[in-house]
Amino acid sequence: MTVTIYDVAREARVSMATVSRVVNGNQNVKPETRNKVNEVIKRLNYRPNAVARGLASKRTTTVGVIIPDISNVYYSQLARGLEDIATMYKYHSIISNSDNDPEKEKEIFNNLLSKQVDGIIFLGGTISEEIKSLINQSSVPVVVSGTDGKDDHIASVNIDFKQAAEEATQYLIEKGAKTFSLIGGEYSIKAQDDVLEGLKNVLSQHQLKLDDTLHLTGNESYKSGIKTFEQLQSNLPDAVLCISDEQAIGILHSAQDAGVKVPEDLQIISFNNTRLVEMVRPQLSSVIQPLYDIGAVGMRLLTKYMNDEEIENPNVILPHRIEYRGTTQ
């Protein structure tokens, strides 16, 4: 039989209001009364109803998490960092997969609000104008991790993609590359815009230009990388910058199948540095994003908003580095 708050109150010989105050951490309870109620709660194995507690305290200690593709290892590493910090601060996560579908994202966002979550966090992906509007009108705090929504008013955690692209491009030029391709995702996000800007900046410094026919997009998957290489093959560049590890590996394998030598004929750098980069041969050169930290810092930033703590900087930029492995010279 389910133990109720009434059972605890009767056993402890206090009012249900007193039990509720103890359960919700209200300090206006005498220590001896609190101890007695907690002893009864433990003995009866009473489990407070989370929804009822939320109605009483106006908090549910739950956060909504929206992930574009839960099967993608990039997002799973972000989620791991987020979940560890959520647990540390005693929050529970409701994780929803949006399939990179803006309409589904809106539906999930509104559904999470109806569940009275205390906050929402987006992990990577695209922040559409409609979602941005929902975020700005949201009754609960929202943070985006792994993207920044092209809006300084939205709290975010990310790396400096422009700087990373500049560093990668400069390195490749020093290794002899003169023609470049940029492979992005099918949706425009600020990270991709920043990579494009960084690439063009360095190319212009060396009197080089990006051929528009070599700026391609796909869905960030391995198969997309294979299809992308088919488009590149007739006008093969010296180097490719790839937003996604999976895309980059698809290009690598297709190049090898076509007899293209990597890195002698084609150099490749990706921007995710998931565990996949060390599972291929040659190992993939990649911009190292601190994925766990991006998720963790995003969750910590959200807890600050939810608990009305002071926010020094709502747009956090974490350090990156580039690991040059076997796909670059």
Swiss-Prot record:
SUPFAM superfamilies tied to this protein: lambda repressor-like DNA-binding domains (SSF47413), Periplasmic binding protein-like I (SSF53822)
Looking at the UniProt feature table, which residue ranges are given for the DNA-binding region?
5-24
Instruction: State the name under which the record lists this protein.
Output: Catabolite control protein A
- Segments forming domain HTH lacI-type: 1-57
Task: Work out whether the entry's keyword set contains Repressor.
Answer: yes
Q: Does the keyword Transcription regulation apply?
A: yes
Q: What does this protein do?
A: Global transcriptional regulator of carbon catabolite repression (CCR) and carbon catabolite activation (CCA), which ensures optimal energy usage under diverse conditions.
| A Pfam family of this chain | Peripla_BP_3
Keyword annotations of the record: Activator, DNA-binding, Repressor, Transcription, Transcription regulation
Q: Which PROSITE patterns match?
A: HTH_LACI_1 (PS00356), HTH_LACI_2 (PS50932)
Q: Which GO terms describe its molecular function?
A: DNA-binding transcription factor activity; transcription cis-regulatory region binding
